[in-house]
A protein has these predicted regions:
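Soluble "head" domains of membrane/secretory-pathway proteins
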Residues: 1-125
Length: 125
């Protein structure tokens, strides 16, 4: 949904579509918002903490093996979002410098429907 974020801001748990660093030549990335502007994020002992509290995962995810940049606390600026892929140990996301924190202007829209193999289709939470 390309219009959703014209009227509201992304929330933790939202699945967004974006182009890293606004690169129009890049393919689209689909990742889950973990933290929003003003939040502080750190990954320790394989778990995500936002503002000092354990992040409440809405899906089953593996313990994180590589905290990347989030080994040290990251404070999000006014227009930044911290995103992670649901496949935590095989995902290019905000933990890595080539993706980093996502600026709102780079967000293309909100994902709302999944199409996969037969039986793996449906609306996203």
């Amino acid at each position: 949904n390309q219009f959703h974020y014209f009227f509201s801001d992304p929330n933790p748990g939202d699945i967004i579509v974006f182009r890293p660093n606004g690169n129009e030549k890049s393919h689209y990335y689909v990742r889950r918002v973990i933290a929003v502007p003003g939040d502080k994020v750190i990954i320790k002992n394989g778990a995500v903490y936002v503002n000092g509290k354990l992040y409440n995962e809405t899906t089953d995810v593996a313990s994180i093996e590589d905290a990347g940049l989030a080994v040290d606390e990251i404070e999000l600026k006014e227009d930044e979002y911290f995103v992670l892929g649901d496949n935590r140990n095989n995902s290019e996301d905000s933990r890595y410098a080539n993706i980093g924190n996502i600026k709102k202007e780079y967000i293309v829209g909100k994902a709302w429907f999944r199409i996969g193999s037969i039986g793996d289709m449906g609306f996203l939470d």
